[in-house]
């Protein structure tokens, strides 16, 4: 979809490489886009690593690079885009978070901020994430707020004129 992680990464790659890629919407989302790459219907694709991980394990694709600041812990042989000379950071990385409605008492927000990271440290949760090729990057509330402030600057520049 427009302005989701895949699109942001593609825009960053275009800008860094000085190229223009064709944007081909897919009604089936990331899984449909991955199928198009595997079938040779498109020359390449920008997908979530969790989708690409499974296709790579099956031997149907080669992952050329990751749009992140560091290599993926489960695919350490795949370089980052920056390592390959492309100015592509982690602005497209899809993070998951816990949200509450506006007006939620601060005591509840503080309790969630204190306890949620431990939930993700659970071995069962970590194992499921690893099986899907998604290493966890557990962040505090303050780290998330700082990350979004930095991303806002990057995205405003990247999306200007679209």
Annotated model-derived regions:
Residues 1-162:
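Conserved, function-defining micro-sites of small-solute handling proteins
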């Amino acid at each position: 979809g427009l302005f989701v992680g895949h699109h942001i990464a593609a825009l960053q790659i275009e800008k860094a490489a000085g190229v223009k890629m064709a944007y081909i919407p897919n009604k089936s989302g990331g899984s449909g886009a991955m199928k198009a790459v595997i079938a040779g219907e498109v020359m390449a694709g920008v997908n979530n690593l969790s989708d690409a991980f499974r296709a790579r394990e099956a031997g149907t694709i080669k992952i050329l690079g990751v749009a992140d600041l560091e290599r993926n812990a489960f695919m350490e042989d795949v370089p980052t885009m920056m390592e390959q000379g492309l100015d592509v950071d982690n602005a497209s990385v899809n993070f998951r978070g816990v949200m509450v409605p506006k007006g939620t008492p601060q005591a509840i927000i503080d309790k969630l901020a204190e306890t949620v990271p431990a939930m993700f440290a659970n071995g069962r949760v970590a194992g499921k994430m690893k099986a899907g090729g998604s290493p966890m990057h557990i962040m505090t509330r303050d780290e998330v707020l700082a990350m979004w402030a930095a991303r806002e600057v990057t995205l405003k520049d990247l999306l200007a004129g679209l």
